[in-house]
């Protein structure tokens, strides 16, 4: 089995970052390793791949991959074997995919302007938003990117490329509240690209084009802003409330103070505490070759972990999902 060894640098950097101040402790480091599992996934030759923005893992360690061609949803075991596939409407608008607390599958679609809830087998249960129509009112989205589902069933949608807001719905899909607007000030968004919730109900939003993560209460109160750690593309939260982030280094446009987001100059994964402390920094191999080699990524987008701590990463330009195994 071929593998690509990826050095992982643990950084004990205490970034306790509130809305107005940054506290920093001394920096220490240690080293661990991940390797790419070249046997994962095992996909039939006739199953095509396209841009692959989303990945999630259910309670049984089944891995759901969301790609922009049909069948858009591919479900794999940890050993790489393919369990099942199913199609969605407007697959070329696929974005992030999540598993709710009841085991149902939630999918954000930036083309159909919807958030949809499915059974694990692909039966449609609920649609939020009006398919094919963008808007900024209580019943519409404008390119919604992601959703966080609380144990209560409440739904928080990051909306998105067009509206730059977070929208709250109850478990039945009824509108409750919203907050956010376009901007760079605390509580504003340039692009709310991904969202997760911890076990205490705090919401973590990847404000990608502002190169920061913002933390909110479920009422929309701003709790913290984590600047200059990473340009965050995708988020994942573990059962013990560690926040995993995939993205790229923060960089400025040459000769300007503005941030440069695209194209990314590198590929990173970080593990953060609930206080914004960087617990782990994982530099990944980047390629600009559309084919790429195993272990390389090109516009990393989605991140998920299974119960054994294995990483599942997807990328846009690389058109694939990959598994990385942590080494002792």
Residue ranges and their predicted role:
Residues 3-16:
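Bacterial N-terminal signal peptides
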Residues 16-328:
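Eukaryotic scaffold repeat domains enriched in small/polar residues
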């Amino acid at each position: 089995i071929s593998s690509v060894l990826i050095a992982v640098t643990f950084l004990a950097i205490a970034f306790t970052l509130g809305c107005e101040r940054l506290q920093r402790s001394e920096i220490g480091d240690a080293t661990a390793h991940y390797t790419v599992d070249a046997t994962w996934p095992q996909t039939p030759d006739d199953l095509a791949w396209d841009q692959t923005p989303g990945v999630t893992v259910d309670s049984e360690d089944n891995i759901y991959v969301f790609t922009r061609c049909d069948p858009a949803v591919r479900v794999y075991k940890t050993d790489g074997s393919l369990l099942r596939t199913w199609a969605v409407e407007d697959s070329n608008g696929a974005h992030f995919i999540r598993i709710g607390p009841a085991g149902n599958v939630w999918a954000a679609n930036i083309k159909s302007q919807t958030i949809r809830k499915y059974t694990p087998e692909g039966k449609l249960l609920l649609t939020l938003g009006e398919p094919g129509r963008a808007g900024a009112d209580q019943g519409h989205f404008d390119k919604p990117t992601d959703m966080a589902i609380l144990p209560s069933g409440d739904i928080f949608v990051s909306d998105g490329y067009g509206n730059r807001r977070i929208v709250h719905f109850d478990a039945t899909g009824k509108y409750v509240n919203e907050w956010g607007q376009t901007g760079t000030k605390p509580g504003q968004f340039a692009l709310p690209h991904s969202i997760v919730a911890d076990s205490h109900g705090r919401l973590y939003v990847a404000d990608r084009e502002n190169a920061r993560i913002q933390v909110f209460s479920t009422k929309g109160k701003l709790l913290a802003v984590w600047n200059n750690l990473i340009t965050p593309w995708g988020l994942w939260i573990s059962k013990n409330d560690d926040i995993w982030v995939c993205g790229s280094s923060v960089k400025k446009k040459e000769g300007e103070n503005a941030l440069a987001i695209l194209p990314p100059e590198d590929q990173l994964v970080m593990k953060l505490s609930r206080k914004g402390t960087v617990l782990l920094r994982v530099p990944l191999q980047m390629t600009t070759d559309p084919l790429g080699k195993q272990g390389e990524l090109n516009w990393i987008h989605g991140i998920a972990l299974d119960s054994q701590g294995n990483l599942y990463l997807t990328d846009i330009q690389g058109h694939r999902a990959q598994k990385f195994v942590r080494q002792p």
